[in-house]
């Protein structure tokens, strides 16, 4: 599943639905979603008998955020272990894989080491089956200090103020975990 494009949730169901509808209609968020979905499809197509992706993204609602999601299914031509497949898909466009060369600019522009941010998190069993996702929200704990990480997809129509607000929404999910 490709996840990209986000907005906040609301306790008011009508407002929550409105926010979700705005997200579904957002050209900027749909572009972000399409970039991620196309990359996944392209990687899978090279190794699959067939690949099927939904024509339109759907909403996935979590506790404090909702995302655009494109379900993607594929029948691989030959068995591929979960870690090998993750290696083929990583890094995703969400963390700088596109446009080409963007990932190499990030350390210079950010001026910090991302550590394990954006790595694969999940499980893999002895048969190499598994389920993994990209760690786009994570925390590094060192003694009494917690460094929280979250990010956004930046595309042509991105607004820095809106992207900062989206990052803050994503970080809010981590605060209760590290505050205890």
Language-model segment annotations:
Residues 71-180:
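Conserved hydrophobic core element of enzyme catalytic domains
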